[in-house]
Amino acid sequence: MEVRTCLVAAGLVLAAGTASAGPIPMDTPIKLGNVETVCTGIGEGKNDPRWRTYPVRVELVDASARYIAGAHVSLSDVTGASMAEFDCSGSWVLFRLPAGLYTVSARLTASPVTPATARFQPPQTGQTRIVLRFPAQP
């Protein structure tokens, strides 16, 4: 009986934590807690008309504004509480999330350059474009 109680308690602690995933599949919407996200931006997948319905599009670019693929992405709310963390193999990350003020941060998986961060609010209509620009690699 004690083992079952401990397992239930451990499950509740995990459920209360950050919604996280390892690498998420390309061009496939997934739900992480209150956040729906899509990793895309490569090849024909980026032209899917569904992606225009997402209110937030985060683009990963280098110092010359060329798309970069592959980053560990973190999303937090206005209090700094982590809402989602995952690895994206694409150069775009789309979000559908409740109204509010958020911070998105990305760290390139194949480079030691400084992470890029931006604060944003989802628009009431349309799509906002957030560009995370990474400095030139050393």
Placement of each model-derived feature along the sequence:
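Short, surface-exposed beta-strand/beta-hairpin micro-motifs centered on an aromatic residue
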Residues: 90-96
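A short, structured loop/turn motif at beta-sheet edges
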Residues: 77-81, 97-100, 122-125
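Short, acidic Ser/Thr/Gly-rich low-complexity loop/linker segments typical of extracellular
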Residues: 79-90
